[in-house]
Amino acid sequence: MCSSDLRVSFGGRSKEFTDKDRRLSKFLIKHKHFSPFRHQHVMMIIKAPEFVMRQWYKHVVGIETTSDHPTKDHAWNEISGRYVEYSDFYIPENFRAQSSDNKQASEGLVEDQENAEKLWSDAQQKSIESYEKMIEMGMAKEQARSILPLTVYTQVWWTASFQSIMNFIELRDEATAQIEIQEYARVLKKIMLNVFPETTKLWQEVYWDAQEK
């Protein structure tokens, strides 16, 4: 991040990230003074199944809400099924069993993997074939898409602040999050360590490493 973002209150400006800036950043992160971390933004193109995106777009921490444009530092644009035809679908490697003590979690695998895969594949194939036939007969894409499963891949252009992305990683790269979105959070972490290495490492020291202990 730009060290000047840390010192707005003092009117200071700098182009270098010094040890002093590093200590200040860690102090601000530790004591939850997050506003300086909303000035840095990343724009990403994300391809993910619809059921993952439904969880993703709920993340709003780190978004400016005090202006007349409440999402001015956060943008979300998705490919529309009204204009394009869907043709790519997520296929899981295995089928997990429902957790015995957590209504929203999974644990282990379904014992009959072969039958689970057949049931899943048959249902997917039926909806996809019906969608394609509806398109062929001239039905409007905006209507035909309504029968597609949540495994359909969509693409999103996502612009978010540094804080917003850190919050996403903290909540989704975590044992109780759904496995599929955990995988995206881990990729995001690698991206942020490359784009903002110093500040991301500090965030990791304060929050992620402590979370794993």
Annotate each language-model stretch with its function:
Residues 1-213:
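Family-specific signature for flavin-dependent thymidylate synthase
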